[in-house]
């Protein structure tokens, strides 16, 4: 289902994720290796194969996460597939409802995590959200549980929301994300 690129990560959390990133040729080569790896162990379902890429462009296998990840929204935006629904259907024994030849990567998507953190120390910051406004509009998606008046508990993951944008090109997606983040309060 394509690839995502984590451009900023902090404390094992992906802060900024985007896709697609690779050329069609590299995507096909890496994709065939991923499929072969899943087939070799008999895995059927959703998973993220993670790789590190060096300055020469060579990939090194890191790990497989056999689950839907926080940044699955990038893949959903560029493929049009609802990965959570597919994962549930596969787990229920329905099989994978996608033919690999039908998968088309369209446009560019970026996801940004919005965290409840102290802006100076970046430590988690529990407390009340006195005001909360999420962006909206064409090509903008927000996944969140937070709202005005929400009390963020002290024992929590600092994730408040994921702001995801889609546009036909990466430069347009960057502009759309800047606008969406400027709307966020």
Model region roles, listed by residue range:
Residues 1-185:
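ATP-dependent carboxylate activation and anion-phosphoryl transfer catalytic cores
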């Amino acid at each position: 289902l394509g690839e995502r690129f984590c451009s900023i990560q902090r404390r094992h959390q992906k802060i900024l994720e985007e896709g697609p990133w690779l050329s069609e040729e590299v995507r096909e080569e890496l994709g065939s290796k991923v499929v072969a790896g899943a087939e070799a162990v008999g895995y059927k379902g959703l998973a993220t194969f993670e790789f590190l890429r060096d300055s020469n462009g060579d990939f090194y296998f890191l790990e497989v996460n056999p689950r839907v990840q926080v940044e699955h929204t990038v893949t959903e935006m560029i493929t049009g597939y609802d990965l959570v629904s597919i994962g549930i259907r596969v787990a229920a024994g329905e099989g994978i409802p996608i033919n690999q030849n039908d998968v088309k990567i369209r446009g560019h998507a970026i996801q940004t995590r919005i965290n409840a953190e102290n802006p100076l120390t970046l430590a988690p910051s529990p407390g009340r959200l006195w005001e909360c406004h999420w962006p909206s509009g064409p090509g903008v998606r927000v996944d969140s549980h937070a709202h005005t008046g929400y009390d963020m508990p002290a024992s929590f993951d600092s994730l408040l929301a994921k702001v995801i944008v889609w546009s036909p090109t990466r430069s347009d997606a960057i502009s759309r994300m800047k606008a969406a983040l400027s709307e966020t309060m």
